[in-house]
Regions:
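Intrinsically disordered, low-complexity domain-flanking/linker segments in eukaryotic proteins
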Residues: 40-52, 122-126
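Serine-hydrolase catalytic-loop signature spanning alpha/beta hydrolases and amidase-signature enzymes
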Residues: 58-66, 70-71, 87, 113
Length: 135
């Protein structure tokens, strides 16, 4: 409903510079994620671009029941540009459709994947940022 402007909350602004990816999760579930990279980095040409200084995993707010990985594009793009870091927002599963602890498991699985694979991808060390649930 929020994406259609049918709630008191305005529809999110989705920026064209974000890249949608999925990360593996336990079982057969794939975690939808969205990332912003500093303008000095392009994954397609890693050899000639400047590697990110690190990676921020963004855990969006919403009390495990609202919002998604595309809800804060403007803020995440700002973080990427100001810090020189890659910023990945995790689209964890939401209650009540997917009751607790499914959302928490998605966040844990995304973090584990980024810790185990981020350096190999040239993304640097992992830190966490977020609002409400992500604090």
């Amino acid at each position: 409903m929020r994406w259609n402007g049918e709630t008191a909350l305005p529809a999110p602004i989705v920026l064209p510079g974000g890249t949608n990816i999925t990360l593996p999760s336990r079982g057969s579930h794939e975690i939808p994620c969205r990332y912003f990279a500093p303008k000095t980095y392009t994954p397609e040409s890693q050899a000639t671009s400047i590697a990110p200084k690190g990676t921020f995993m963004h855990i969006h707010g919403g009390g495990w029941v609202l919002f998604d990985e595309k809800s804060t594009d403007t803020l995440l793009n700002f973080y990427a540009e100001q810090t020189g870091c890659l910023v990945i927002s995790v689209g964890y599963r939401l209650a009540p459709e997917d009751p607790w602890p499914k959302g928490v498991e998605d966040v844990e699985d995304a973090a584990q994947y980024l810790v185990e694979n981020g350096r190999d991808k040239g993304w640097g060390d992992l830190s966490y940022i977020g609002g409400e649930v992500g604090d």
